[in-house]
């Protein structure tokens, strides 16, 4: 005869699921674009946790899109191949040799690692880059920087077709040039452009910081676009947070409902953000 021990852990689990119900209903059939930064990928355990979160999103009716970076992995491969990098105003020049390494690492290593882990956790993921089906057509950002591109034309129909078949797109931030070039695209920029093209309900920028901070170093849990602009102007937002918040502003201006900057190294960060009252990072909305 079986017996049941209604211990506190089980009761807490049931209470958590019950509390999540309004959020499960809110995000049913929603499009959520998730940018997974190279520094947020961390260990195999962190990757497994992230993949489980993404699979769960799809299981409860969300249409997730993963856009990934890979800067640390690219740097390691360039060093291994003894390819020297030039910099202009602190930005790497992406020459022919470098863009070949970038594509090899992003599409051939990082992308497939994420795809494989999502599939191992029970999802159906497909690896793409912005070159596939002309998803992301780019113009050269600055001739001095070489093969660095800015998305100028988006074709997201392929992604919608994948949603219809419960497939999770995992996208490397590479764009197609109009003359057959391959362009390296900033990962945040690529994620923002894809989210805007899909009119996503959420753009989640997973990084290695806990969110946008005020002058006292405290994480701000919710901000309006105007506040972000003021904080950039007065220097409160500085350094690497500037391009992330600028991506957020561009995405909001182009139809994304809200953007969140959060620490992707935290276990279940995506679930905490979407399915709990207080979220997990800095939520940015339109004014």
UniProtKB/Swiss-Prot annotation:
- The principal location of this protein is cytoplasm
What pathway annotation does it carry? Amino-acid biosynthesis; L-arginine biosynthesis; N(2)-acetyl-L-ornithine from L-glutamate: step 2/4
Taxonomic classification: Bacteria, Pseudomonadati, Pseudomonadota, Alphaproteobacteria, Rhodobacterales
Location(s), subcellular: Cytoplasm
Spell out the molecular function terms from Gene Ontology.
acetylglutamate kinase activity; ATP binding
Annotated EC: 2.7.2.8
Q: Name one GO biological process term.
A: arginine biosynthetic process via ornithine
The cellular component terms of Gene Ontology attached to this UniProt record, alphabetical and capped at eight, are: cytoplasm
InterPro entries with a match to the protein in the record: AceGlu_kinase-like_sf (IPR036393), AcgluKinase_fam (IPR004662), ArgB (IPR037528), Asp/Glu/Uridylate_kinase (IPR001048), Glu/AcGlu_kinase (IPR001057), NAGK-C (IPR041727)
Q: What is the superkingdom listed in this entry's lineage?
A: Bacteria
| TM helices/strands, residue ranges | none
User: Per the similarity annotation, which family is this?
Assistant: Belongs to the acetylglutamate kinase family. ArgB subfamily.
Q: Provide the gene name from the record.
A: argB
Keywords tagged on the record: Amino-acid biosynthesis, Arginine biosynthesis, ATP-binding, Cytoplasm, Kinase, Nucleotide-binding, Transferase
Q: What is the protein name given in its UniProt record?
A: Acetylglutamate kinase
* Role this protein plays: Catalyzes the ATP-dependent phosphorylation of N-acetyl-L-glutamate.
Q: Which reaction does it catalyse?
A: N-acetyl-L-glutamate + ATP = N-acetyl-L-glutamyl 5-phosphate + ADP
Q: Where does substrate bind?
A: 70-71, 92, 184
The UniProt site entry described as Transition state stabilizer is assigned to 35, 244
């Amino acid at each position: 005869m079986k017996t049941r021990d209604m211990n506190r852990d089980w009761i807490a689990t049931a209470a958590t699921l019950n509390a999540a119900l309004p959020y499960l209903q809110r995000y049913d059939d929603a499009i959520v674009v998730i940018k997974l930064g190279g520094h947020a990928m961390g260990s195999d355990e962190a990757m497994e946790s992230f993949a489980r979160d993404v699979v769960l999103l799809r299981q409860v009716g969300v249409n997730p899109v993963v856009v990934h970076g890979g800067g640390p992995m690219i740097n390691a491969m360039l060093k291994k191949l003894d390819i020297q990098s030039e910099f202009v105003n602190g930005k790497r020049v992406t020459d022919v040799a470098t863009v070949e390494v970038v594509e090899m690492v992003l599409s051939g290593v990082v992308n497939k690692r994420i795809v494989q882990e999502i599939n191992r956790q029970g999802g159906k993921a497909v690896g793409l880059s912005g070159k596939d089906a002309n998803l992301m057509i780019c113009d050269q950002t600055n001739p001095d920087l070489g093969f660095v591109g800015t998305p100028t034309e988006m074709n997201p129909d392929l992604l919608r077709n994948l949603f219809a078949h419960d497939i999770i797109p995992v996208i490397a931030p590479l764009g197609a040039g109009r003359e057959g070039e391959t362009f390296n695209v900033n990962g945040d920029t690529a994620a923002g452009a894809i989210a805007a093209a899909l009119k996503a309900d959420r753009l989640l920028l997973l990084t290695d910081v806990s969110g946008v901070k005020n002058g006292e170093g405290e994480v701000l849990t919710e901000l309006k676009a105007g506040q972000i602009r003021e904080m950039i102007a007065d220097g409160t937002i500085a350094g690497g947070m500037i391009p992330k918040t600028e991506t957020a502003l561009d995405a909001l201006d182009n139809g994304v409902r809200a953007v969140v900057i959060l620490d992707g190294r935290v276990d279940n960060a995506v679930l905490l953000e979407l399915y709990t009252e207080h979220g997990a990072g800095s939520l940015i909305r339109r004014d």
